[in-house]
């Protein structure tokens, strides 16, 4: 079994994946994009008869899927699968699954951080410091 993992978020769990896949004698290849994702043409270039893809936001369209003759399963790291041509996959017996809730913690943390940033005027302070000014709110004491 050959597996291609392109989702950058999986890099921190690489040792766990390696241990898990070694139990199944799977050949795992990690290729991460320099930016957020691979486009369809880049996916064609890195695909090498893998049976399973674990992807992030990579473009998995009909152009790529036509060249992926050995592909049997696509796993989307995260909830949304709008980057995957699901109709083509259904018609060609390629199963697609996702991992809803996997990124929920990170989305929640980011949301709280943005709220805190607004509450503390962090961006206003960054802008004023970059302009050579020091914005200081009046003291309440």
Residue ranges and their predicted role:
Residues 1-50:
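N-terminal glycine-/charge-rich "phosphate-binding" loop or analogous flexible N-terminal tail
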Residues 51-130, 140-141:
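Phosphate/diphosphate ligand-binding glycine-rich loop within oxidoreductases
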Residues 1, 137-141:
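Rossmann-like dinucleotide/phosphate-binding beta-alpha-beta segment
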């Amino acid at each position: 079994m050959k597996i291609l993992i392109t989702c950058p978020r999986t890099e921190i769990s690489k040792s766990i994946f390696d241990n898990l896949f070694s139990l199944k004698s799977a050949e795992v290849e990690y290729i991460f994009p320099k930016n957020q994702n691979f486009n369809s043409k880049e996916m064609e270039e890195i695909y090498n008869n893998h049976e399973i893809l674990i992807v992030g936001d990579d473009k998995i369209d009909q152009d790529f899927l036509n060249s992926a003759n050995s592909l049997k399963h696509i796993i989307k790291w995260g909830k949304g699968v709008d980057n995957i041509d699901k109709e083509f996959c259904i018609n060609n017996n390629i199963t697609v699954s996702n991992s809803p809730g996997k990124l929920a913690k990170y989305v929640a943390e980011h949301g709280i951080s943005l709220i805190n940033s607004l509450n503390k005027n962090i961006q206003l302070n960054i802008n004023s410091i970059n302009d050579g000014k020091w914005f200081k709110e009046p003291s309440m004491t």
